[in-house]
Amino acid sequence: MPVVVKFVRQLAHDLRNHLNAAELQSAYLIEVAENEELRDEVKRLRGMIAQVGVSLQELTAALSPPRLTEMPYAARDLMEDLQQKLSASYPAESAAVKWDDASADAQLNIDPQLLLPALTELFANAFRHGRAEGPITAAARSENGRFVFTLSEPKQNFERSTENWGLEPLHSPGQGHYGLGLHRTRAIVEAHGGEFAASYDKETGSLVTCITLPLAAPDA
């Protein structure tokens, strides 16, 4: 799989170079075109080219090792920010999530600009992939010097293996999605010195994702 990832990153880089050339050419055509309608069409084409470039940039970013800019962050603030982000992005779905934040005064040292989207990705998957009847529950606590976050989502007849959860990029691609979300989330968690795991609880019919992060040192 590392070879495939390297190939995709190089391919995306090469395609972006071609898109940059097309962008420059379209800018030139806008300048020399005498017909206003033609200029408008070239501008529209330029916008399409730019969107492809954005998609390729997002693809390569998802496959690149995370670069952290860490700062002290209260676990309670992280949970509050996560709830606000979910409410803004998924107002209907997030309203039904049950929260249990027992992290108390736990302190973390994280990059919130990376970790918040990584956690949001877990909820996005829970909202749109094979959800069964029942509430999604999210819980946070501190335990043995670690911050523990668990997400439980109801799923019936779940048969996928969770052994390599988040270790198989490009596994389930679809239109506009390339199977990179869990891979990126896991990479970000592990870059923070954390652990990422998932298991299926047959008794409750729930897929349980567990993330642990080290608590900040007392003087952090």
Predicted feature descriptions by range:
Residues 21-36:
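Conserved C-terminal segment of the DHp
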Residues 125-127:
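Short helix-loop "hinge" at the ATP-lid/N-box region of the Bergerat-fold HATPase_c
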Residues 96-106:
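Conserved catalytic submotifs in the C-terminal HATPase_c
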Residues 189-190:
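Detector for a conserved hydrophobic position within an alpha-helical segment of the HATPase_c
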Residues 133-145:
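Short beta-strand/loop element within the Bergerat-fold HATPase_c
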Residues 148-176:
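Glycine-rich/acidic phosphate-handling loop/turn and adjacent ATP-lid/helix
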